[in-house]
Amino acid sequence: KEGYLMDHEGCKLSCFIRPAGYCGRECAIKKGSEGYCAWPACYCYKLPNHVKVWEYATNRC
């Protein structure tokens, strides 16, 4: 599974003012294989199926 990580409000996890490597660390915490800042939000690859990712259809932000 891949996609944008979400914050506690269900919005994309911002990386706009974060240091280099921030998204990779956040993706690793969620057990993803890798991630990067797809400006302005963190995008992850190979996440476990139980991890919730941002979806356009259910966007509230």
Curated annotation (Swiss-Prot):
Residue ranges of domain LCN-type CS-alpha/beta in the record: 1-61
Annotated Gene Ontology cellular component terms: extracellular region
List all disulphide bridges recorded for this chain.
Answer: 11-61, 15-37, 23-42, 27-44
The protein's location, in the record's own words, is: Secreted
Q: Which domain of life is it from?
A: Eukaryota
Tissues where this protein is expressed: Expressed by the venom gland.
Q: Name one GO biological process term.
A: defense response
- List Cysteine amide occurrences by residue: 61
Q: What GO molecular-function term can you cite, just one?
A: toxin activity
This protein's UniProt keywords: Amidation, Disulfide bond, Ion channel impairing toxin, Neurotoxin, Secreted, Toxin, Voltage-gated sodium channel impairing toxin
Principal cellular location given in the protein's record: secreted
State the similarity comment: Belongs to the long (4 C-C) scorpion toxin superfamily. Sodium channel inhibitor family. Beta subfamily.
Domain writeup: Has the structural arrangement of an alpha-helix connected to antiparallel beta-sheets by disulfide bonds (CS-alpha/beta).
Role of this protein:
Beta toxins bind voltage-independently at site-4 of sodium channels (Nav) and shift the voltage of activation toward more negative potentials thereby affecting sodium channel activation and promoting spontaneous and repetitive firing.
What is this protein's name? Answer: Beta-toxin Tce4
Q: Which organism is it from?
A: Tityus cerroazul (Scorpion)
